[in-house]
Curated annotation (Swiss-Prot):
GO terms for MF: initiator methionyl aminopeptidase activity; metal ion binding; metalloaminopeptidase activity
Gene Ontology process terms (BP): proteolysis
Amino acids binding a divalent metal cation 2: 104, 167, 201, 232
Identification of the protein by name: Methionine aminopeptidase
DNA-binding among keywords: no
GO cellular component assignments: cytosol
UniProt entry keywords in alphabetical sequence: Aminopeptidase, Hydrolase, Metal-binding, Protease
Binding-site residues for substrate, renumbered to this chain: 76, 174
Reactions listed under catalytic activity: Release of N-terminal amino acids, preferentially methionine, from peptides and arylamides
């Protein structure tokens, strides 16, 4: 069932999203060569507790506050002693439960001297996200977002992960509807309605669209070992516009 949020609930979700945007302000500068991903996760946990929140992923059984995925890791990267290297693409997928309201966003950070093809992957994935958000309007169907995301990726001949997708969010981490990044897949295709809050999250690769789960039971990697990129925003749908609730703050924009 799709959960239509009240204005008061959207206010609560917005507050959670603003806290998450502030977290990214201070987290992204810490993503440097020599840093362990578990150090970044510990920082996220401290920040989230400091604002009165709880790491959202705990409710899903994930044992960390942040999914930190590097290079061939697509999503759900389990923080560990893995050390960030110069040239890495590091995805930071974080959610906050603040007073029962859930935020969800992902930023991908290029570290040091990143290869041109990886920077292009990041640029295009970000373009896909913008296209998906533009297509997310009251009255439009979910697959309009799928088509918009896929069209950008296909134009640049990048792989598009189809096994994972965007989703409703706000009162739980994962709500209906699912929002695929590939059109033509089977499944419901409802219209976006005012009061819906969703996470739009393109996942692109330099190679295959196939993925597998690593031995840790969480980390999803590309089947061919190619580099991946993941970006995500939480957005709220209104009758006359769509609001990006996890929009970067001025600090992050100018950082």
């Amino acid at each position: 069932m799709i959960r239509i949020k009240t204005p008061e609930q959207i206010d609560g979700i917005r507050a959670s999203c603003k806290a998450l945007a502030r977290l990214f302000d201070v987290l992204i500068p810490l993503v440097k060569p020599g840093v362990q991903t578990q150090e970044l996760d510990a920082f996220c946990q401290r920040f989230i507790r400091s604002v009165g929140g709880v790491p959202a992923w705990f409710s899903e059984g994930f044992p960390a506050a942040a999914c930190i995925s590097i290079n061939e890791e697509v999503i759900h990267g389990l923080p560990s002693a893995r050390v960030i290297q110069d040239g890495d693409l590091v995805s930071l997928d974080v959610g906050i439960n603040l007073n029962g309201y859930i935020s969800d966003a992902c930023r991908t950070v290029p570290v040091g001297g990143v290869a041109h093809e990886r920077l292009e992957l990041l640029r295009v994935t970000t373009e896909c996200l913008r296209a998906g958000i533009k297509a997310c309007r009251a009255g439009a169907r979910v697959r309009a977002v799928s088509r918009a995301v896929y069209a950008v990726a296909a134009r640049h001949r990048f792989g598009v992960v189809y096994e994972y997708c965007g989703h409703g969010v706000g009162l739980a981490v994962h709500e209906e509807p699912n929002i695929p990044n590939v059109p033509g897949l089977e499944g419901p295709n409802p219209r976006f309605l005012p009061g819906m809050v969703v996470a739009i999250e393109p996942m692109l690769t330099l190679g295959t669209d196939e993925v597998r789960t690593s031995a840790d039971g969480w980390t999803v990697v590309t089947a061919d070992g190619s580099c991946a990129c993941h970006v995500e925003h939480t957005v709220a749908v209104f009758a006359d516009h769509t609001e990006v609730l996890t929009e970067p703050t001025e600090v992050e924009r100018t950082g």
